[in-house]
Regions:
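Acidic, Ser/Pro/Thr-rich low-complexity regulatory regions
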Residues: 2-67, 71-84
Length: 84
């Protein structure tokens, strides 16, 4: 398992155990995060960047963020560990 996968697993477990501290998991918050991610996806398409494969770690990170499993700060920290 690479460092990003390891940190994601640890973060998911810690957030679940702590009751998702400081993460708004309401339907409205999920909708807002989904709208923001859709905006970023459109922006990336315009810039010519390919969408990540649906089963990739990057795509799973976005889904976990939208669902409120990880915070924006945690998303960024894990994304920085992705291989380039």
């Amino acid at each position: 398992m690479n460092p990003a996968e390891t940190l994601l697993a640890q973060t998911l477990a810690a957030n679940a155990a702590a009751g998702y501290p400081d993460i708004d998991r309401s339907a409205a918050a999920r909708g807002e995060r989904a709208r923001h991610q859709a905006y970023l996806a459109r922006k990336h398409r315009i810039e010519g960047l390919p969408a990540p494969p649906a089963d990739s770690l990057e795509a799973r990170l976005v889904r976990h963020h939208i669902d409120g499993d990880i915070s924006a700060a945690q998303l960024i920290a894990i994304t920085r560990l992705l291989p380039r």
